[in-house]
Structures are given as structure tokens and as C-alpha cells.
Amino acid sequence: MNLFSNGVDVGRRRQAFKAALAAPHIARLPGAFSPLIARSIEEAGFEGVYVSGAVIAADLALPDIGLTTLTEVAHRARQIARVTDLGVLVDADTGFGEPMSAARTVAELEDAGVAGCHLEDQVNPKRCGHLDGKEVVRTDVMVRRIAAAVSARRDPNFVICARTDAAGVEGIDAAIERAKAYLDAGADMIFTEALHSEADFRYFRHAIPDALLLANMTEFGKTTLLSADVLEEIGYNAVIYPVTTLRIAMGQVEQALAEIKEHGTQEGWLDRMQHRSRLYELLRYEDYNVFDQHIFTYRKGENNE
């Protein structure tokens, strides 16, 4: 086992991720706000890992209004991709600028070892897709954004997903027409942001019958939460849970801190904590110990052919 990189090379991870998107069963991608969460997602048996721009911003105590940089996003994506054999899909916002910036974004994220990214049709700087007051660029501007990203791609298995926020701005029919244009520009998958109801998802799938579609099941937003089974029955190929793990973690942290402040001890939380032994197991402490022991006892000519 290589302790400091993946057990599966990036080319095979991308192939497997693309195959999962085309499989009969929906690919479920929980969001990871850290490499350790990504490893937990893999051990839980999911089909992929999602890295949310909103979560990267929140982890830096910033709002999701386009304040993070390509450097910050690529750095976190690389950290996460390093520790999991699953394909990682990254939120690349608007591509961090003009079409040439979108092209550079794809190059940087390919170098980071992820399986794909999505680009959106909001103006730059953007805002959270479930907030009011969003603005979208003209369709031809987003088409150039997608075309630039596709032209910069070196690995044909790197997935380029086009996200449209137009449903909440121009209406669902306009979003459908945009999706068709983005597919014509070379997008591999369409992310339909902030649809409201199951009926909306069915309507969108009926209008775009053959393309890969991704659904966003984020909490406390504009979208009714649908199960993976329902989305699969509708015909969606992937579903993300972008902020779920962060919200669970932060909810628990805030409750625990309040109790510690009130009672002066964390003892009441011990049965709700991850045990030290489980953390060590997740971190693969024993593998590091074996590696260290081998190096410590290394002798020239012994087991080093």
C-alpha cells in the first residue's frame, strides 16, 4: 500500500467515475469538506465524492459569493483526491473568470487528480444557487465558457459538467434550451440547479432525454428533497449532497460546545464522539507503523532488491 497517494491511478479513477455515471443505478456523491471525510465516504460505499465551492468557502469562514480562488479550490481538491480511490467531482463555480480562465481551471483540476468539474452560467462573481438575486450570463457566453473548458481537457475521461442556474431566473423552459446548447458545446453532463419539485425534475428529464443529468439535494434550499431511488426512477444519473456532512458536523459541534460551556465537561458527549481507535483505523495508523518499522530496521541488501 502506498501511504501517501491513491491505490488506483487517476486514469482508472476517471474511467470508473464515468462508468458509474452511465450505470443503471444512480451515482451518489456526498460532499467532502476535508480529506478525512472523503475517506469516510469511500468506506461507507458511495460511488463518488463531491467537493462543493460553498463548503470550501464556508471552511474558510467566507460566504459563497465568489470569494475563493482557483488556487484554493485546486489545492483542496488535490488534498481530497489524494486520499480516496473514488472519482472526485469539483465545483469550479464560473471557471474563475473569462473563457480562458475556465480553460486554465480545467487544466489545474486535471493536474489535481480529480475526475471532473462543473462550470455554471452565473455571472462572475457568482452567488449561492439557492439564493435570490442570481444573474446568469447570455447563453452564448456560457457556450464559450464550456467550449474553452473542453478544448483545454487532456484526458477525454475528465468529466465536464455544465450547471445552469437559469430555471430560477428565466424559467425552466429557458434552462432546458440552455442545457441543449451546453451539450452541443461539448458538456458531458448537465447539472440542473434549484429545481423546486419532483415534477420539475421529471419535466427536465423528459425534455433532455439522452444526456447525463445531475441533481442537487442540498438542505434548506429551494429544492424538495427527493430520495436517490426516486431520482433514479426519474432517470437522473447522479445526485450530490454538497453541504450535508458539513452541516451535520457543525450542528454537532455547536451543540457540544454549548454543553461544555454550561457544564464544564465533555463527558456527556463521549458516546456520540468518534472513538480514538476508530480515528486511528481511518487514518491507517497501523500501516504507517509497519512502514516506519521497516525503515527503522532497514539493512543494505536485506529485502531491498
Curated annotation (Swiss-Prot):
Keyword Lyase: yes
SUPFAM superfamilies with a match to the protein in the record: Phosphoenolpyruvate/pyruvate domain (SSF51621)
Record Pfam families: PEP_mutase
Annotated EC: 4.1.3.30
Positions with a binding annotation for substrate: S52, G53, A54, C128, G129, R163, E193, N216, M217, T218, R247, R276
PROSITE patterns found in the cross-reference section: ISOCITRATE_LYASE (PS00161)
Keywords: Lyase, Magnesium, Metal-binding
GO biological process: propionate catabolic process, 2-methylcitrate cycle
Main enzyme class: lyase
Signal peptide from the UniProt entry: none
Domain of life, per lineage: Bacteria
Binding positions for Mg(2+) per the UniProt entry: D91, D93
Catalytic activity: (2S,3R)-3-hydroxybutane-1,2,3-tricarboxylate = pyruvate + succinate
GO molecular function, one term: magnesium ion binding
Cofactor or coenzyme needed: Mg(2+)
Alphabetized NCBIfam families for the sequence: prpB (TIGR02317)
Family: Belongs to the isocitrate lyase/PEP mutase superfamily. Methylisocitrate lyase family.
Self-association state and partner proteins as the record states: Homotetramer; dimer of dimers.
Note: The prpD1B1C1 operon seems not to be involved in propionate degradation.
Role played: Catalyzes the thermodynamically favored C-C bond cleavage of (2R,3S)-2-methylisocitrate to yield pyruvate and succinate via an alpha-carboxy-carbanion intermediate.
UniProt name for this protein: Probable 2-methylisocitrate lyase 1
Gene: prpB1
